[in-house]
């Protein structure tokens, strides 16, 4: 309960700090005088990312069934309204005949976050500049929005458990998670190409740092390939013992796909049709796909688990890492080892939030909307500009004051509606990840189970497929413009 109080206390503290900004720009300048000036298009996205991070921590804590059940009792059991909801709802049936309080807590938190961003997405449809009266819903009113978000989280505990356990919400969560994963995979491939184009472009310019740039390009490629090879060897050594034939297939097939896309990227026909193709992109895609396979095989419900990954357990026991309430630190009935799964969960949680934040911010820009096939046309009033290029006409004294400069008076820098829509499906994706893709079991250990295994394995195959198509499409369809 202390963790819950501290988490929601953090939200309350953050809300209190935002009250000053609600009172006017002078208060912000007084509180943040030493901070550099920034634009509202940047500060707004950062603020929403922080809110999503705090909400994710709250959902993480809710994985402890005792915390979720205790919060429900403290907040609602003494409420007459909740008594009516509790005693009139149908009984929950699970394989163990025990209510999955941890999963229910996660679903309620992410349900609130999803509704919050869906509401803002609907309210900001068609906004073309900050002069629109609806701009305050997106760039301001932070204290009110924080109250609404926290209120939605608390209010979600009054909703019948059968709503979250039922098939309808499960399908909604699954569809939203799959949509976010597709966007995430497209951005991963795009990131690989952008990274390669950036470094190769500097080499072709012939700058003084060209030699260092070549060293960076080669070093990054070698390090990523070394990561793929090392992790693959370790997986073959630790995860292919006994009757682990399926894990053996997953690892071997992933290695074959990695070699295939790497060799394909070096084919003369591919290089001619797509000059930007290279081994760096293949290494980025292969590294992420190999991580997904490792995370999958570490969650296979069998005896195919080594006694490794002691570091996360050691750091957690010494207080350097927060306790992970959803990880059972003992072998499960299936014979799996919790140490390996703990490492997969810690790394997976970090990568999940990074990808959520990156995807939510990147997909809202005009260039990314075009790559996703969602650009609204050439007349779309979205300017993709460098926020640092905003002109400041104020005097020197005002420049020393912290101000959030409105750089969207003429046109918005990104699609506000699609920005919130991405956060909404990101909340559903994180909900499905934390609930092991909604297994609806009471004693669930996150990351364990065939649903989680197959989702991650198939995801690795889809990434290879998307990347392979980006290389072969210009060859197979030379008349089309893929720029």
Swiss-Prot record:
The keyword Lipid metabolism applies. Signal peptide: none annotated. GO terms for biological process: phospholipid biosynthetic process. Keywords: Endoplasmic reticulum, Lipid biosynthesis, Lipid metabolism, Membrane, Phospholipid biosynthesis, Phospholipid metabolism, Transmembrane, Transmembrane helix. It is found in: Endoplasmic reticulum membrane. Enhances the incorporation of serine into phosphatidylserine and sphingolipids. This is Probable serine incorporator. The gene is serinc.
């Amino acid at each position: 309960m202390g963790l819950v109080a501290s988490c929601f206390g953090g939200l309350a503290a953050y809300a209190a700090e935002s009250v000053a900004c609600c009172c006017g720009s002078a208060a912000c300048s007084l509180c943040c005088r030493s901070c550099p000036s920034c634009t509202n298009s940047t500060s707004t996205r950062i603020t929403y990312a922080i809110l999503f991070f705090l909400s994710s921590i709250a959902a993480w804590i809710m994985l402890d069934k005792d915390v979720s059940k205790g919060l429900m009792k403290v907040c609602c059991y003494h409420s007459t309204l909740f008594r009516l909801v509790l005693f009139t709802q149908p009984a929950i049936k699970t394989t163990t005949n025990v209510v999955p309080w941890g999963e229910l807590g996660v679903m309620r938190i992410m349900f609130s976050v999803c509704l919050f961003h869906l509401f803002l997405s609907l309210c900001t449809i068609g906004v073309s500049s900050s002069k629109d009266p609806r701009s305050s819903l997106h760039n301001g009113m932070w204290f009110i929005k924080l109250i609404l978000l926290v209120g939605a989280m608390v209010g979600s505990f009054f909703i019948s458990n059968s709503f979250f356990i039922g098939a309808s919400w499960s399908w909604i969560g699954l569809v939203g998670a799959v949509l976010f994963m597709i966007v995430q995979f497209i951005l991963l491939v795009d990131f690989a190409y952008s990274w390669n184009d950036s470094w190769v472009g500097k080499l072709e310019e012939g700058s003084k740092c060209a030699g260092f740039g070549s060293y960076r390009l080669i070093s990054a490629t070698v390090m990523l390939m070394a990561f793929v090879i090392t992790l693959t060897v370790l997986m073959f050594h630790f995860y292919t013992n006994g009757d682990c034939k399926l894990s053996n297939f997953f690892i071997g097939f992933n290695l074959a796909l990695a070699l295939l896309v790497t060799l394909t990227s070096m084919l003369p026909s591919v290089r001619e049709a797509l000059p930007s193709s290279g081994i760096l992109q293949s290494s980025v895609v292969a590294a992420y796909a190999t991580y997904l396979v490792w995370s999958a095989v570490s969650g296979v419900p069998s005896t195919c688990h080594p006694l490794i990954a002691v570091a996360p357990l050691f750091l957690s026991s010494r207080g350097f890492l927060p306790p992970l309430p959803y990880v059972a630190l003992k072998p499960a009935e299936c014979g799996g080892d919790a140490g390996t799964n703990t490492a997969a969960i810690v790394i997976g949680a970090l990568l999940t939030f990074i990808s959520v934040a990156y995807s939510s911010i990147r997909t809202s820009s005009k260039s990314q909307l075009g790559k996703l096939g969602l650009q609204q046309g050439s007349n779309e009033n979205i300017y993709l500009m460098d926020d640092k290029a905003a002109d400041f006409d104020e005097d020197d004294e005002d420049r020393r004051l912290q101000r959030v400069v409105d750089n969207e008076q003429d046109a918005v820098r990104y699609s506000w509606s699609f920005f919130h829509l991405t956060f909404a499906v990101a909340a559903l994706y994180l909900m499905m990840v934390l609930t092991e893709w909604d297994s609806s079991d009471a004693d669930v250990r996150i990351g364990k189970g065939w649903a989680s295994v197959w989702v991650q394995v198939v995801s690795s195959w889809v990434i290879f497929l998307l990347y392979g198509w980006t290389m072969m499409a210009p060859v197979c369809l030379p008349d089309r413009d893929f720029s």
